[in-house]
């Protein structure tokens, strides 16, 4: 499949970079969390509160299975999607996976700046929880086809598009 799949921690810039990449490549943007919200008619926060995390992860798996038929898309995943059910391997079948690696200190700054957030796993700006999440997820994220270690938006954008074109053989 010829898709770009963006993975990484919450607040790593997946949605923002996804929008820009989709404009450059003239690909449709798919945000997995937004798709789940539309399917369920509820926000992610409400889904977690009413049905729990396991239910939400089942919905993510449904989304992955639907995406296997897609091509020429930029897919921005929820931060936990690659982690559960060995989804990282399924995502790599869907397209070129890009891990947006942002230093923990920068993620904490972004979380504090944003304040109370709609992300259910980042409630109450719990920096210790974010730190644990980071440590637990990094090994799986690093299985992506490429890793972008840059907090500069424009440089990241250029690097991702170049790496994708190289992967695709353009």
UniProtKB/Swiss-Prot annotation:
An annotated GO BP: aromatic amino acid family biosynthetic process
Principal subcellular localization? cytoplasm
Which residues are listed as membrane-spanning?
A: none
- Tell me which CDD domains the record gives: SK
- The residues that hold ATP are 11-16, 119
Pathway info: Metabolic intermediate biosynthesis; chorismate biosynthesis; chorismate from D-erythrose 4-phosphate and phosphoenolpyruvate: step 5/7
Any GO molecular function = shikimate kinase activity
Q: Per the entry, which co-factors are needed? A: Mg(2+)
> Is S-adenosyl-L-methionine included in the keywords of this UniProt record?
no
User: InterPro entries annotated for this entry?
Assistant: P-loop_NTPase, Shikimate/glucono_kinase, Shikimate_kinase/TSH1
Checking SUPFAM superfamilies in the record gives: P-loop containing nucleoside triphosphate hydrolases
Q: How is the cofactor bound?
A: Binds 1 Mg(2+) ion per subunit.
GO cellular component, alphabetical, reads: cytosol
Reaction(s) this enzyme catalyzes, per UniProt: shikimate + ATP = 3-phosphoshikimate + ADP + H(+)
Please verify whether the record's keywords include ATP-binding.
yes
- Where substrate binds, per the record, is at 33, 57, 79, 137
What EC number(s) does this enzyme carry? 2.7.1.71
Q: Which Pfam families match?
A: SKI
Q: Report the locations given in the UniProt record.
A: Cytoplasm
Q: Member of which family? A: Belongs to the shikimate kinase family.
Functional note:
Catalyzes the specific phosphorylation of the 3-hydroxyl group of shikimic acid using ATP as a cosubstrate.
Specify the protein name. Shikimate kinase
- State the gene name recorded for this protein: aroK
């Amino acid at each position: 499949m010829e898709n770009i799949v963006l993975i990484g921690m919450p607040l790593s810039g997946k949605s923002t970079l996804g929008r820009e990449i989709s404009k450059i490549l003239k690909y449709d943007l798919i945000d997995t969390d937004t798709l789940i919200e539309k399917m369920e008619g509820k926000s992610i926060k409400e889904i977690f509160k009413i049905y729990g995390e396991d239910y939400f992860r089942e919905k993510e798996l449904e989304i992955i299975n639907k995406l296997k038929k897609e091509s020429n898309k930029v897919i921005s995943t929820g931060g936990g999607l690659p982690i559960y059910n060995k989804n990282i391997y399924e995502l790599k079948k869907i397209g070129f996976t890009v891990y947006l690696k942002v230093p923990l200190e920068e993620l904490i700054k972004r979380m504090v700046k944003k304040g109370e957030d709609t992300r259910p796993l980042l409630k109450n700006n719990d920096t210790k929880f974010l730190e644990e999440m980071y440590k637990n997820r990094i090994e799986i994220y690093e299985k992506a086809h490429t890793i972008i270690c840059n907090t500069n938006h424009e440089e990241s954008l250029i690097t991702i598009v170049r790496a994708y074109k190289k992967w695709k053989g353009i």
